[in-house]
Amino acid sequence: MPDYNYLGQKTAIERYNSLELALQIDSRVINFADNYKNDAKTLSQIIAEKRRFPRDKFELLRKAFPCMICSLRDYAEYIPLEHDLFDIIIIDEASQVSIAQAFPAILRAKKMVVLGDRKQFGNVKTSNASKELNNAYFKRVKEALERDKKIDSSDVTMVRVEKLNISNSILEFMESLSNFEIMLKKHFRGYPEMISFSSRYFYGNYLQAMKVRGKRIEEVLEFVQLEHDDRFDIYKNTNEQEAEKILELVLQQIELEDFRSVAVITPFTEQQTLISNIFTDHERFDEIRKRLKFRSFTFDSCQGEERDIIYYSFVASRNKDRLWAVLPKSMDAQDEEELDRNKKLQRMNVAFSRGKEKLVFVHSKPISEMSAGKEVLNHYKTEIKNAKAMPSVDDVDQNSPAEKRVLEWIKQSKIMKYNPEIQPQFEIGKYLASIDVDYRQPECKKRIPGGGAVWENL
């Protein structure tokens, strides 16, 4: 195998591009500060007073700051209304942005890049908007198009116009207009076992985790099952025992000087509040908050967040179990009583893709008895089982007798008392190819009877 340092090459290219970009941006800012001091003061006052930029002054600002980060509302309130004002406008989390919110940006852009995921949460405000009022306004929009643009109701354009509805996200609308669409398959946040649930149930097993797990599976996935003490919880949808156990585990982490970031995710708002209160009341809360960046979320509020370690508090016990009200009873089949199944599935996808280093599942009821969500826990149980399973001779390259002997030697060695994980046929070439399109697997020379040779990829 040739000497190949992908990370070194990638880092060098990124460093060069970053320096080049910083040089260009810094030179523009310095030029603006040196040659337009009075304009800088005027613009500073305009920004402080939150007034709309004058067209001529905004042109100076655009040249000095070619890259701007702002909210969608800012386009309408401060930036002049003019076509093609920006070369490219990028909208992130587009599934959460309604068409109405995005219009001020669309009108000012030459090109649009829209990033989003329909399998995660959409816009809450538009989903709660009055359908009757929306239909009335939308009818007026279609009538205006038919009248002013002479568009027939059967025209192809009118089919696209149907997507121009406040109840749709800008992601859904742009899908009907875009000339290029691609699925981002590479996952950089967590290990393959951590993202495997979302990849299997939501993305057809297409996600490619870029992090290679170099530690034991127990350090990545952990189950903590509590024997519920039948304690009566004052508030509904709470489990004080789980909250206290999570606090205990976090304090142990602090004692071990493990300062990886931490969050707790739970299906119920009441449990989120209880966990937040228990942590806040503890004497070391300031240390936990600052060192571990601790926060508590519900399945509905964790989108866009990430932490090194995620604790999941499922709340359900033998005495009470309302998981069915928040999570799907089955990932494959819809229950007759489930009216909001799509929202429940989105919760699952969002919540179980927040972790970077470790997922810890804290539950007070046997998985098989849970009213909902059991499939996700069984999935991760299987991931642990598969990782710990000892490979057999059938798992190695059948064309290589030496590999079978090496596997037997490992099984007979002293290292086995440490319960190691053995991964036969680790596809390092496939992994390198997934992170570098220019990578080519090395070739070996294979001799054939009768003389001659043929080159084949390893």
PLM features: what roles do these ranges have?
Residues R73-E77, T269, R295-C302:
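Conserved helicase motor
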Residues I47-F202:
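ASCE P-loop NTPase helicase motor core
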